UniProtKB/Swiss-Prot annotation:
Gene assigned in the entry: rps18
Family under the similarity heading: Belongs to the bacterial ribosomal protein bS18 family.
PROSITE patterns xref list: RIBOSOMAL_S18
GO biological process, one term: translation
Keyword annotations from UniProtKB, A to Z: Chloroplast, Plastid, Ribonucleoprotein, Ribosomal protein, RNA-binding, rRNA-binding
GO CC, any one term: mitochondrial small ribosomal subunit
Alphabetized Pfam families for the sequence: Ribosomal_S18 (PF01084)
GO molecular function terms noted in the UniProt entry: small ribosomal subunit rRNA binding; structural constituent of ribosome
Alphabetical list of SUPFAM superfamilies matching this protein: Ribosomal protein S18
Naturally occurring in which organism (per UniProt): Eucalyptus globulus subsp. globulus
Protein name: Small ribosomal subunit protein bS18c
Classification via PANTHER family: 30S RIBOSOMAL PROTEIN S18, SMALL RIBOSOMAL SUBUNIT PROTEIN BS18M
Highest taxon listed in the record's lineage: Eukaryota
Main location: plastid
Gene3D superfamilies membership: Ribosomal protein S18 (4.10.640.10)
């Protein structure tokens, strides 16, 4: 019985703790593009808190800074290059439909 109980005990493995994405000296500001760009996806969307590994307060400040940068035209609202490629190829195919009676 003693031996079977010992089989279920797992050895504690040490793991490397990840560095926080925002250091104590970093200032969250709409002008700090190098910091803000780390928290935006390729499409220009704000990444979630779980993906960023930020605290609630940090995520709120990052979101406000990104929105201010967008309003002041420092960041684009959308960064969807595929949309433009697709619209050029389908531009000739669209037309008015006529109803035959």
């Amino acid at each position: 019985m003693e031996k079977s109980k010992r089989l279920f005990l797992k050895s504690k493995r040490s793991f490397r703790r990840r560095l926080p994405p925002i250091q104590s000296g970093d200032r969250i500001d709409y002008r700090n593009m190098s910091l803000i760009s780390r928290f935006i996806s390729e499409q220009g969307k704000i990444l979630s808190r779980r993906v960023n590994r930020l605290t609630l307060k940090q995520q709120r400040l990052i979101t406000i800074a990104i929105k201010q940068a967008r309003i002041l035209s420092l960041l684009p609202f959308l960064n969807n290059e595929k949309q433009f490629e697709r619209s050029e190829s389908t531009a000739g195919a669209t037309g008015l439909r006529t109803i035959n009676k």
